[in-house]
Amino acid sequence: MQDRFIRSITQLPTPLADALIPMLHQNFAGHLDAQQLATLTSASKMTEAEVLLALLPIAAALAKPPISEFYVGAIAKGKSGDIYMGANLELPGEALFHSVHAEQSAISHAWLSGESQIVDIIVNASPCGHCRQFMNELVEGSKISIHLPAQESHPLAYYLPYAFGPKDLNVTSPLMAKQQTEFALDSADPMIIEGLDHAGLSYAPYTQSFAAVVLETRDGATYCGRYAENAAFNPSMLPMQMALSNLVRHNREFSDISRAVLIESSQGKISLVGATMDALHTVAAIELEHIVIDPV
């Protein structure tokens, strides 16, 4: 079991903890498939809802909040039945808008893993307005069931009435819907090819600034992030922040980063290079490779 879970595992009921410990192997980064969730439910003799709430301390252990020191964990349950943990991330000494909220982390985890719809969000603190707006961008976002400790579950529409969303800006294919933009780039570099794939899967209906970031660590592992825009603009999630959240979930240190690539569309109304460099240079003393690509 990874050291970061030693304290949080003690907060779980013993039967649940005993069943979970073998799953917290060295490569665990917050994903449990539907069968594993069923195993935990059976072994603990708890309901699925009780298990998900009980797992929140494990999700919170993925957090990296050097500014607030407030650890928030969230779990996104996909339509597949799999669950995806996420946690808040803050960049030391940097402006607060670079922060990643736990719900954003969990949702981006699910999206990067191929999920196409979130049905439940479980979180240990009431979602802030920023996260409510972020969730509202998702497929059937208003129907997502929000679960909080010691409270009744409610759909997102309960927390965000009279919501402003994609449909108000004539966007009919929301975040996580199956869609891909094709780009042309001739490269044999595996890291650039990976970034190209993720840029094509990014979500930028308001600016057409499709983009992705790939981070490589010294051992050759890669961690990606995609751009995820929002109808309210400010809650948009930048690809560098998503990539850093991905890296931290995998229990890697910022000092492990050896290479960083931003790939973005030449036809976008904005560029993410400035914000991406700011975030990168806060955590790693390396240069950003910036590649601009043409849509097919």
Swiss-Prot record:
UniProt-recorded Gene Ontology molecular function terms: cytidine deaminase activity; identical protein binding; zinc ion binding
Cofactor note: Binds 1 zinc ion.
UniProt: Zn(2+) binding residues: 101, 128, 131
Top-rank lineage group of the source organism: Bacteria
Subunit structure: Homodimer.
Family assignment from sequence similarity: Belongs to the cytidine and deoxycytidylate deaminase family.
Protein name, entry field: Cytidine deaminase
